[in-house]
Amino acid sequence: MATEATGAVEAAPGMPQLDFSTFPNQIFWLIITLVAIYLILTKVALPRIGSVLAERSGTITNDLAAAEELKLAAVEAEKAYNQALADARAEAQKIVAEARAEIQADLDVATAKADAEIAAKSAEAEKAIAEIREGAMASVTEVATDTAQALVAALLPSAKDADVSAAVAERVKG
């Protein structure tokens, strides 16, 4: 019997799927298979896929909200940083100005003190120079008088020392 069925199949021309005598049987199994696939998809696979998609959507939404909050916090932190930086710069400029004023005041005091010391030393030096000049002039006058007296005594032995001294003093004065 198996050989007869095999022989009939071999004798039939064309593809067995296109044999119209087996269409009702193939359509029945096609419907059963499609219904089984539909039930498996609707009861098992699609709910899992839907839950994964919903979870992903929730995660993305939460992440976007967190990112927006962090962005706002970063903007606020940047504003606070810029304000603190501006305050620090202003404070630094204030400190620099105070330090400059203090240094200038110290410099003015030191300059005034140095000027006073220089003026005092200058007065002392001028006094010493005047004393040295007077001493030098006295020495010059004395040397000139002695020299003149020696010369006059050699040339005119009868000349008086007082007259020679008076003549030298008058000549030295100018």
UniProtKB/Swiss-Prot annotation:
Membrane topology summary: Single-pass membrane protein
Q: Which domain of life is it from?
A: Bacteria
Q: What parts of the sequence cross the membrane?
A: 27-47
Q: Which GO terms describe its molecular function?
A: proton-transporting ATP synthase activity, rotational mechanism; proton-transporting ATPase activity, rotational mechanism
Q: Where in the cell is it found?
A: Cell inner membrane
- Please tell me where this protein is predominantly located: membrane
Cross-referenced Pfam families: ATP-synt_B
Q: Which InterPro entries match?
A: ATP_synth_b/b'su_bac/chlpt, ATP_synthase_B_chain
Keyword entries, A-Z: ATP synthesis, Cell inner membrane, Cell membrane, CF(0), Hydrogen ion transport, Ion transport, Membrane, Transmembrane, Transmembrane helix, Transport
What GO cellular-component annotations does this UniProt entry give? plasma membrane; proton-transporting ATP synthase complex
* Function, as annotated: F(1)F(0) ATP synthase produces ATP from ADP in the presence of a proton or sodium gradient. F-type ATPases consist of two structural domains, F(1) containing the extramembraneous catalytic core and F(0) containing the membrane proton channel, linked together by a central stalk and a peripheral stalk. During catalysis, ATP synthesis in the catalytic domain of F(1) is coupled via a rotary mechanism of the central stalk subunits to proton translocation. Component of the F(0) channel, it forms part of the peripheral stalk, linking F(1) to F(0). The b'-subunit is a diverged and duplicated form of b found in plants and photosynthetic bacteria.
NCBIfam families the UniProt entry points to = PRK13454.1
Subunit description: F-type ATPases have 2 components, F(1) - the catalytic core - and F(0) - the membrane proton channel. F(1) has five subunits: alpha(3), beta(3), gamma(1), delta(1), epsilon(1). F(0) has three main subunits: a(1), b(2) and c(10-14). The alpha and beta chains form an alternating ring which encloses part of the gamma chain. F(1) is attached to F(0) by a central stalk formed by the gamma and epsilon chains, while a peripheral stalk is formed by the delta and b chains.
The record's similarity note reads: Belongs to the ATPase B chain family.
Question: Protein name, please?
Answer: ATP synthase subunit b 2
Which lineage is the organism of this entry classified under, starting from the top rank? Bacteria, Pseudomonadati, Pseudomonadota, Alphaproteobacteria, Rhodobacterales
Per the record, the gene is: atpF2
